[in-house]
């Protein structure tokens, strides 16, 4: 029994110990809450003190505002009294000026109608003079352009007509040239018999070549040059017989140094065997000359913009035709080496084409120059039109400024003319008077009314 009671007592003691521990923790929490509440109470006390100070300042501000409000109310009552006095004075002035305003309004309407009529007449006259002046100046600007365009059209028409005549005359010229070549062939054959030396043959070939160039219409020093000295890449010297210039900074080389000794022997031979041998030598000499001329490669020379081929000129038509009859492939073989064999007939036709190219180039240059001048003239015309618009705007601004200045002189109460005339009426010494029509427009008021204003 005692043991059970001890056990029970022990259990009760353990429970009390647990409650004691719980109470201790609760007490500790209460202590913490008390400390926190004490801090909050202190903060509330400080806040209450601040609110008291703020309430005191608010009371002071309220007193000041009440004082200011009383002053403002007194000021407002004074202003209301002044406003009533000013309103009464304003009504009196409005009543006194209303009649004058009615009279002035009717006079102003009449003056405005007169001024509008006068301004319309002035604007119509100015517009008419301005239109006449503009038309005259526009004609002065357009007449040169019209004349230049007409001249250009005339030159183009003449160029087309000239080209048509030249095409027609070219066929006639070729027919005449064929007949001439027949005679030249006979004369050249006889002349060949007389030309024995290689140097003499070369000089004679150059002479015939230059005569053909002149006959084609080409001018020395302009469309062609003779004996031009050129330098190769390795410093070697070349001197072609003739350089024919083409449009676009191109040149054509013409060589006239072909040997005709074998052909002279062919003409002079009486035996068929000797003639065949001489003809064979003539073809061989011509081939050798083509090969040597091709090896010079004029295209690589400094300062020369040659075409891909060189013209080999044979001054005797019969020598050319005889070689082709004996060797039909001669022309094609030479062409494969960039050499074109030409006679006086074929060269003249080629030169005619070159001369036509030069004429076309000069016409194109003239057309470009005319187009540039026409464009420049058109640009100046555009600038003139812009200046014309600006002049019109300035005239409109000038009219507005003139109307504004005129209004300052004659319109409104106390305008300049009215005030100036009132000074004169008050006794200002003046030797001159304003025009009557200006005084009528300004409606000069009597001195008494001016004083009232």
UniProtKB/Swiss-Prot annotation:
Q: Which UniProt keywords apply?
A: Coiled coil, DNA recombination
> What's the superkingdom here?
Bacteria
Q: Which InterPro entries match?
A: DNA_recombination_RmuC
| Pfam hit, one | RmuC
The biological process GO terms on file are:
DNA recombination
Q: Coiled coil located at which positions?
A: 16-201
- Purpose: Involved in DNA recombination.
So what family is this one in? Belongs to the RmuC family.
Instruction: From the Swiss-Prot or TrEMBL record, give the protein name.
Output: DNA recombination protein RmuC homolog
